Amino acid sequence: MRVVFHVPGRPVPKARPRVTKKGYAYTPRKTMAFEQSVVLAYRKSKAAGEPFPEGVPLMMELTFTFEPPKSWSKTRREEVIRRGMCPTCRPDLDNLMKGVADALNGVAYKDDGQIAGAVIRKQYGRKDNTRVIIETMDQKEG
């Protein structure tokens, strides 16, 4: 089984929970909005609507595309896209993946602990977006 979908807009890393003066923890709005857009994109792309079976190891491939900074010249912006250069600044890859994996908990799979392998990359592109591929891993008997 394999699912491929795109999430439009700038990728948002999973932020740490914030705590109010009274001690209540909450997830920041920006993180919640991104997680909701991931779920919406997943539901729009899914053909059968069935989540991956519980206990099945999954492989996740994530490509986070960022527009080059507006402060760069048009020539430089075009060059980094053409040459396939990758951003080396924030946000961190692990937090970007966490945002997508947590958003799909209970939607695409029972728990993100099922993710047994991942390929994650950041790149520059013309539009901000996130490409997600989730598939079952082949089990080889040893």
Which residues are covered by each model-predicted region?
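Acidic, proline/glycine-enriched N-terminal capping motif
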Residues: 1-142
